[in-house]
Curated annotation (Swiss-Prot):
EC number from the UniProt entry: 2.1.3.-
BP GO terms, sorted: methylation; terpenoid biosynthetic process
Subunit comment: Homodimer.
Phylogenetic lineage: Eukaryota, Fungi, Dikarya, Ascomycota, Pezizomycotina
Keyword presence, S-adenosyl-L-methionine: yes
SUPFAM superfamilies: S-adenosyl-L-methionine-dependent methyltransferases
Pathway connected to this protein: Secondary metabolite biosynthesis; terpenoid biosynthesis
Identification of the protein by name: Methyltransferase adrK
Length: 278
């Protein structure tokens, strides 16, 4: 279901999008603050107001919780155990896509850490978010990364026509849960199509998971999201392997995450996963 349709359905069922907006943004945590000060050259005393203004503009585009609660500032890619490999490979020429990148904040982490920006790709359904990312990081004049507004399931999108078989790494963070289980399988297969058809092609995921799926999916009547537990996550990739004939090595871990600790649902945690083509 398209996010606009999801929101419309949720509102009809009594959901108030404004409930996702928090006014309690009083500081910008690391590493986002350092990136905004040193990469974007924003004076320290102006960082907080700069972020608040951007947050308000973005929430008007679409009321995602990650925007309303400013969790897009909680950069997470560097906390993945796969990050050293991802960074090293991009430095050596591999191409990495952040799928559902929002403002491209994780890509700026890679660039700040020395990744050549021209080897990085970001895609989001909403072109406004890609533009807002350029405003957030003030790098419109010099960043060489490739930003593509696209629906990952649209066969005719620029993402598909330009990048099928061309990528080496795809990073997916806080994205898959907005789809139901069967659609997640379609997305996973599409991502595999985008990757180079060779051993070592890599998907790295950060997934909202729940120890008790009954609790995690109890909000479906209002927000039709699908929260995995470990068993369902493994089942997803087993299905993908069965349907594609590909052999994948799937490694999972529980990832310490500030966003999960603040989540209102009981038993929510952040599931990290790497899916490597063999």
């Amino acid at each position: 279901m398209h996010p606009d349709s999801q929101l419309e359905t949720a509102v009809k069922n009594g959901f108030d999008p404004k409930s996702l907006y928090s006014t309690e943004l009083t500081k910008v945590n690391e590493p986002a603050r350092t990136i905004l000060e040193q990469y974007s050259k924003i004076p320290a005393e102006k960082v907080l107001q700069h972020v608040k203004d951007l947050k308000d503009r973005a929430f008007e585009v679409f009321p995602y919780a990650c925007i309303g609660q400013a969790s897009f500032l909680e950069l997470s890619i560097a906390s993945s155990p796969c990050y050293p490999e991802m960074l090293d490979r991009v430095k050596k020429g591999d191409r990495l896509l952040d799928l559902g990148c929002a403002f491209g904040q994780e890509l700026r982490q890679l660039i700040y850490d020395g990744a050549p920006s021209q080897n990085l790709y970001g895609t989001d359904l909403r072109p406004e978010f890609l533009e807002l990312g350029l405003d957030l990081f003030l790098d419109r004049s010099f960043i060489k990364s490739h930003f593509i507004d696209a629906d990952v399931l649209d066969d005719k999108s620029a993402l598909v026509t330009q990048l099928t078989g061309e990528l080496n790494i795809v990073y997916i963070s806080l994205f898959l849960h907005v789809f139901d289980f069967e659609t997640q399988i379609k997305v996973a297969k599409r991502v595999l199509d985008l990757l180079a058809p060779k051993a070592g092609s890599l998907i790295v995921c950060r997934v909202v998971a729940c120890r008790d799926q009954a609790i995690g999916n109890a909000t479906n009547a209002r927000l039709p999201y699908y929260y995995h537990d470990l068993a369902s996550w493994n089942r997803l990739w087993e299905r993908v392997q069965e349907e594609t004939g590909l052999k994948l090595k799937v490694d999972n871990w529980e990832q310490d995450d500030a966003l999960a600790k603040k989540h209102p649902l009981e038993g929510i945690y952040m599931l990290g996963s790497s899916i490597r083509r063999e």
